[in-house]
A protein has these predicted regions:
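C-terminal motif of bacterial Sec signal peptides marking the signal peptidase cleavage site
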Residues: 19-24
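Bacterial signal peptide processing site
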Residues: 26-29
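An extracytoplasmic/periplasmic, membrane-proximal ligand-sensing/linker region
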Residues: 44-52, 57-67, 233, 240-309
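Bilobed "Venus flytrap"/periplasmic-binding protein-like clamshell domains
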Residues: 47, 51-73, 85, 108, ...
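Short helices/loops that flank or line small-molecule/ion binding pockets
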Residues: 83, 89-103, 116-117, 152, ...
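Acidic, polar ligand-binding/catalytic clefts
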Residues: 93-153
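A ligand-binding cleft/hinge motif common to bilobed small-molecule-binding domains
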Residues: 104-118, 176-179, 201-230
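Short beta-strand->loop
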Residues: 120-132, 222-233, 240
Length: 309
C-alpha cells in the first residue's frame, strides 16, 4: 500500500484516587472532618491545586507549556503544579492512580491510559498554525547522507523510536513498517530514544540509529536528517480527570475547549507573548473520545502490547 496515499486516508479516517489522609483518625487533634474530605476528594493533591501532567516530548516541554499553565492558574484561581513524568508509562501510571488533574497526552497515551482504567475525558487538541485542524505528522527520517530511500530500506537497520507508548514515535511507525512487511520488533533493531528530539538527534548522528521516527515539530529543527515518509496522526488531547468536581470540569472545558493564543495574551498572561509559545500553540479545538477511534483501529491492526487493557 502506498504510504503517501495512505496518509490522506489516515488523516480523514478503575482510576484510583490518591490517598490523602481521608480515613478518620482517633483523637480530636488529628481527626479528618467531613469538610476536609469534601475539600480534597477528587483532586490529585487538594482543592487549591491542579496537577498538570505532560508526556516528556522534548527538553523544552516545561517551557512550552508554562504559558498555558499560567492561563489555567489565572482563570481557575488555583495553583497549577507541573508534573513531567520520566516516560510515557509513568504518566499513564500517574493517570491511573489519580495523581493528575489535567494533562496533555499523546493520542496513544490517552487510549492506553483509559484502556487500563484511567478516568479521563478529552477537552480539546492544540493546533499550532491558523487554519489547521487537530493533528500532526509522524515522520520517518534518516541521516541526510544516508542511502536509505524508502521505508522498505529500514529492514535490518537500527531504528530509533521514541517510546513504546508514543503515537507518532511508535504506534503509527509500527503500522507503517508492517504495511511494508517489516516487523518493528524483529526485522529492525529498535532503539527507544525516550523523547522526540533525542530520536531526531540520534538518527542525525547515524551511529546508534540508522533511521528513525519523530513528530514533525522536532524534525523541522534539524538539518541533520531528511524525511522519507510522513503520516498524519490524530491531535494530542488536553484532558481532565473525571474525579474532579463537576464545576471544576466545566470550568476547564470553558477555559481550554476553544481558546486562541491571542485570547490568552489578552487575558493578561504575558508569558504567552513569546516566539517559543507561538511555535507550539495557536489555538485549541474541541475533540471527544470518538476522535481517537482511529488509534484504537491501528492498535488492533498492529496488536501493540501497549494497547492492551
Amino acid at each position: 500500500m502506498n504510504l503517501r496515499a495512505k496518509n490522506a486516508s489516515i488523516a480523514l479516517a478503575g482510576a484510583a484516587l490518591l490517598a490523602l489522609g481521608l480515613s478518620a483518625c482517633s483523637g480530636t487533634a488529628g481527626a479528618t472532618t467531613e469538610e476536609d474530605t469534601a475539600t480534597t476528594a477528587g483532586y490529585a493533591v487538594d482543592a487549591e491545586t491542579l496537577v498538570f501532567g505532560v508526556v516528556p516530548d522534548s527538553a523544552d516541554t516545561e517551557t512550552n507549556y508554562q504559558p498555558l499553565m499560567d492561563y489555567i492558574a489565572q482563570e481557575t484561581g488555583k495553583t497549577v503544579e507541573y508534573h513531567e513524568s520520566t516516560d510515557y508509562a509513568a504518566l499513564i501510571e500517574a493517570a491511573i492512580a489519580g495523581k493528575i488533574d489535567v494533562a496533555s497526552f499523546s493520542g496513544f497515551t490517552y487510549v492506553t491510559a483509559t484502556n487500563n482504567g484511567a478516568e479521563l475525558t478529552p477537552i480539546s487538541s492544540i493546533v499550532t498554525e491558523e487554519g489547521q485542524e487537530p493533528g500532526y505528522f509522524s515522520q520517518a527520517i534518516v541521516p541526510t547522507a544516508s542511502d536509505i530511500q524508502s521505508l522498505a530500506d529500514f529492514a535490518g537497520k537500527k531504528v530509533c523510536f521514541v517510546d513504546p507508548s508514543s503515537t507518532s514515535g511508535y504506534l503509527f511507525p509500527s503500522y507503517n513498517l508492517l504495511e511494508e512487511g517489516i516487523d518493528p520488533e524483529t526485522d529492525v533493531t529498535p532503539v527507544f530514544a525516550g523523547k522526540h528530539d533525542v530520536s531526531v538527534q540520534k538518527t542525525g548522528e547515524g551511529v546508534e540509529c540508522e533511521a528513525g521516527f519523530a513528530e514533525d515539530s522536532e524534525v523541522e529543527k534539524s538539518d541533520k536528517v531528511r524525511i522519507i515518509e510522513e503520516t498524519m496522526v490524530p491531535g494530542a488531547p488536553l484532558v481532565y480527570s473525571n474525579t474532579l468536581p463537576d464545576d471544576v470540569k466545566d470550568q476547564l472545558v470553558g477555559i481550554l475547549a476553544e481558546v486562541t493564543i491571542d485570547d490568552i495574551i489578552a487575558s493578561g498572561v504575558d508569558s504567552a507573548d513569546s516566539d517559543g509559545f507561538r511555535s507550539v500553540f495557536f489555538e485549541t479545538k474541541p475533540v471527544d473520545d470518538a476522535y481517537y477511534d482511529l488509534i484504537r483501529d491501528i492498535c488492533e491492526k498492529t496488536d501493540a502490547t501497549q494497547c492492551q487493557g
